[in-house]
Amino acid sequence: RSLVAELGDARSYASRLRDYGGVGRDQVEWVIARLRADPQSRSATITTFEPLIDTTYIPCVSMLDFWAPAGSLELVVYAHSIDFGSKGYGNLVQLAAIQQEVASALGLEVGSLTFVIKSAHVYDTEFDYMRGVLAHSS
C-alpha cells in the first residue's frame, strides 16, 4: 500500500485506483473490460473514495468517468478541491496518462478530458511561485 504522509498516511491515488479497498481490484483494468464488453457504456465510472476508511480525509479527485461516444475515449473527472499551486498540473498529467492507457488498450483515439472542480485554489504560500510560473509561460 502506498501511503501519503502529508495527508495523514492516507492511501495514494495510485493505490486507490489500482488496489481499491486493498483487495487487489484494479479499477482501471475494470474500466477497460467494461468498455471492451460494451463500447457504448455510460457507466464506466470509478472512484478514489473509500468510505470504509476515508473518515477524515476525502480524496480531492474523487471520480473518473470514461466513455467512448464516437470512437474516441472521453474522460470526465470530478474533484471537490484542487490545489493548483503545487498539485493541479501533476493531477492533470496523471489523469491524461490514465486516459491514454485506457484508450490504447481499447484501440481508441484520446478524446477530451474535462475536469470539474468545485474549489480550485492556490495557497498564500505559493503565490510567488505561481507568479513566476505565469511570468515564464507567456
State the predicted function of each range:
Residues 1-138:
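Terminal, non-catalytic protein-protein interaction segments that mediate quaternary/complex assembly
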